[in-house]
Design a protein with these regions (language model features):
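An acidic-aromatic substrate-binding cleft motif
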Residues: 1-7, 401
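Catalytic domains of carbohydrate-active enzymes, especially glycoside hydrolases
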Residues: 9-42, 165-172, 295-299, 350, ...
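Amphipathic, non-transmembrane alpha-helical secondary structure
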Residues: 10-19, 63, 67, 155-167, ...
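Acidic (Asp/Glu)-rich catalytic clusters
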Residues: 15-21, 34, 65-73, 289-294, ...
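Acidic/aromatic-lined carbohydrate-recognition and catalytic surfaces
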Residues: 19-168, 180-186, 196
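Flexible loop residues that form catalytic
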Residues: 29-30, 170, 178, 183, ...
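Carbohydrate-binding surfaces of carbohydrate-active enzymes
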Residues: 76, 217-230, 243-283, 292-566
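Polysaccharide-binding and catalytic clefts of secreted carbohydrate-active enzymes
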Residues: 107-318
Length: 566
């Protein structure tokens, strides 16, 4: 897949897509960014960089691109900002941004009747009833507001926008800005009381939270993400409520309603995980396991600035491997991507995801840089050529590492740091392991008594998978070694300025001694890498349920295909 928020109207963009041939293109804006900004003079600036001004004109542009990409066999997923509103309810020139759209540009022939006359009633509220707002981005000199997802009128607005995008030929949506703030509106007060009533008995509310009469209790805060050091049991219930109710709204708008319009509508969320940040980050950190990704087609998790540079001398590979394995385990081998904000190490970003069940890649497929474009195309065509080993594959492991979600539920993040530490040790030792949540009974399995062994440097990561058709084990090797760009004056590692600074250093002489399933017979072994057009046959020895082989030299990504007798 590819995703772009800028320069997607460049003349080179569509030719690049035709070369790389991604299956999914995240293109276009159909939520609050579009409706807040398309009619303004800020239409072509951050965040959405809309190609033309005007709702009708810009909508027609997206519709034309949807039709074009469909003729090339690509699915188009639109970005859908669910609540972040840019505008001013009033100014010397009247309403601006979203509020101007709602008053003057809501076309009932296009969107149906307005859910409510006054848009201020749909906003998140402070304790005194005023709208929560900020002047953070300063887009067009306007403020930012947030709609309350729990407000039924706002859900009608989102549904109107969902329908309009479906009419324009979109294949699905990725919901972003999927937050809840410290909203104290009547809907949040009511729904949080209902949540507590279902979860706790009256006596428990008294003893645990000092709530004497829930029906009459008015909360002075209902927080969502917050500083873990300032967390309390009640605040974590507020966060859990926020995440559950957000998921319920997502399901209502995109799953139930969206798929009533288009039964195969692709539905995804854009979330944030950083370096496994919890309580202060991760939109699903307290979400119950049975709701985690339920009915969603793929996930986007942003690692932000946590994994877009290397400091090899300190063992920092700038990787998202551990995050990827956590997401894969929670999402049960369904597709996901990591938004690494990586514009330099393009090969590694693609390889890391491919090796761990992900869909390469997130942001910053730099199609205007000739070298980046060449590399992206080469690696995407490699994935297409060997589609059978990636599509619908499942992880193949010899051990599990438990992720301490139950500790997070208690507000104890010490075990998360221990998880990071242990995870890195296992990765450095090249142990084939999955990540499972400790909230799932029986999810863990003991490590094999004599596990597979890989003689490889610690700058290489190893994983394994089974293709959907079976009869094969695929071992993935990702090499992070490189010539690093100079650090800054303070000694901080540099993320680099583009693919010319990726500078990977090939790895040589990796040997392996791996376990194969009991009773299996190896028919042959092949080695593939994006830098070579054809597979290479590898010599091996097999005895007593184990296979030994050596890898040829490769640059960043290599896969060993161990083919088994059916």
């Amino acid at each position: 897949m590819v995703a772009h928020w800028a320069e997607y109207n460049d003349p080179q963009y569509v030719p690049f897509l035709l070369e790389a041939e991604p299956e999914v293109v995240q293109l276009g804006f159909y939520g609050a960014h579009f409706w807040s900004l398309a009619h303004t003079s800020s239409y072509n600036g951050y965040p959405s960089h809309l190609p033309v001004q005007g709702h009708k004109e810009c909508g027609a542009w997206f519709e034309e691109k949807n039709k074009l990409l469909h003729t090339k066999g690509m699915k188009v997923v639109g970005h859908f900002n669910v609540e972040f509103l840019v505008g001013d309810p009033d100014s010397p020139e009247g309403p601006r941004g979203f509020f101007k759209f709602y008053r003057d540009h809501w076309d009932e022939k296009e969107l149906g009747p307005k859910p409510v006359a006054d848009p201020l009633t749909m906003l998140e509220k402070n304790a005194d009833g005023t709208p929560i707002s900020q002047a953070g981005y300063g887009i067009g000199g306007m403020k930012e507001y947030w709609a309350c997802l729990r407000n039924p009128d706002w859900q009608k607005v989102m549904k109107a926008w969902v329908k309009r995008g479906v009419d324009r030929g979109i294949d699905g949506y990725i919901a972003n800005y999927f937050y809840r703030h410290n909203c104290l509106c009547e809907h949040c007060q009511r729904d949080f009381r209902a949540y507590l009533k279902e979860r706790f008995k009256a006596e428990e509310l008294k003893t645990q939270f000092a709530i004497e009469n829930l029906d009459q209790h008015k909360f002075t805060e209902i927080v969502s993400w917050h500083d873990p050091k300032e967390s309390t049991p009640l605040r974590r219930e507020m966060l859990r409520f926020s995440q559950i109710s957000n998921k319920q709204v997502f399901d209502e708008v995109f799953i139930k309603y969206g798929r009533s319009l288009k039964k195969d509508l692709i539905a995804a969320q854009w979330n944030h995980i950083g370096n496994l940040h919890q309580i202060s980050g991760d939109e699903r950190c307290l979400l119950p396991a049975d709701m985690w990704g339920k009915d969603e087609d793929y996930l986007w998790y942003s690692t932000g600035g946590a994994a877009c540079y290397t400091d090899l001398a300190k063992g920092d590979l700038g990787e998202g491997t551990l995050q990827a394995r956590y997401i894969r385990g929670m999402f049960q081998d369904k597709p996901f991507t990591l938004g690494k904000y990586e514009s330099t190490r393009i090969r590694v970003a693609i390889s890391e995801l491919a090796a761990n069940g992900g869909a390469p890649m997130g942001f910053y497929t730099r199609f205007k840089d000739p070298l980046a474009r060449q590399v992206i195309t080469r690696y995407y065509q490699f994935l297409k050529r060997y589609d059978e080993i990636y599509r619908g594959n499942s992880s193949y492991s010899e051990a599990t590492l438990a992720y301490p979600r139950t500790a997070v539920f208690r507000g104890d993040l010490g075990p998360v740091e221990a998880f990071r530490t242990e995870g890195k040790k296992l990765l450095d030792r090249h142990v084939l392991f999955d990540v499972v949540s400790d909230e799932v009974p029986g999810g863990a399995k003991p490590q094999a008594e004599k596990p597979s062994r890989f003689d490889a440097p610690t700058t290489v990561r190893v994983s394994a998978s089974r293709p959907a058709k079976g009869n094969e084990i695929d071992f993935h090797f990702v090499n992070y070694n490189r010539e690093e760009p100079p650090k800054d004056a303070a000694g901080n590692p540099s993320p680099g300025s583009g693919i010319a600074e990726e500078k990977p250093m090939a790895v040589k002489e990796i040997s392996a001694d791996v376990i194969i399933p009991s009773g299996s017979e190896v028919l042959g072994i092949e080695f593939i890498t994006p830098e070579q057009p054809e597979a290479r046959v590898i010599e091996f020895t097999a005895a007593q349920g184990r296979v030994k082989f050596k890898l040829p030299e490769f640059l960043v990504y290599g896969v060993v295909r161990v083919k088994l007798k059916p």
